[in-house]
């Protein structure tokens, strides 16, 4: 939900890139956490939520807000795409 609210605070045209940047920051923060044993100072513990909480966010609207639904669909699509790529890479390696 925090990622959707972070996207909602941005102009529509910036949302896809911002979503990818949040995912990249979460992965970087997770690597930092694993290497150093503590959370990244800016991006948190490696979760998407901790990255999103570090950004300006709109207040969470009701789920019948079409703009918020679009933001959540952007979040889910990015997560699904990233997962699908990981599954495909795993299959190629086996």
Model feature map: region roles:
Residues 8-17, 31-35, 59-66:
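Charged, low-complexity interaction regions
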Residues 12, 23-34, 47, 80:
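Short alpha-helix boundary/capping elements
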Residues 1, 21-23, 35, 40, ...:
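Acidic, Ser/Pro/Thr-rich low-complexity regulatory regions
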Residues 53-94:
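Amphipathic alpha-helical binding modules
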Residues 17-22, 32-39, 85-93:
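Short glycine-rich, low-complexity/disordered patches
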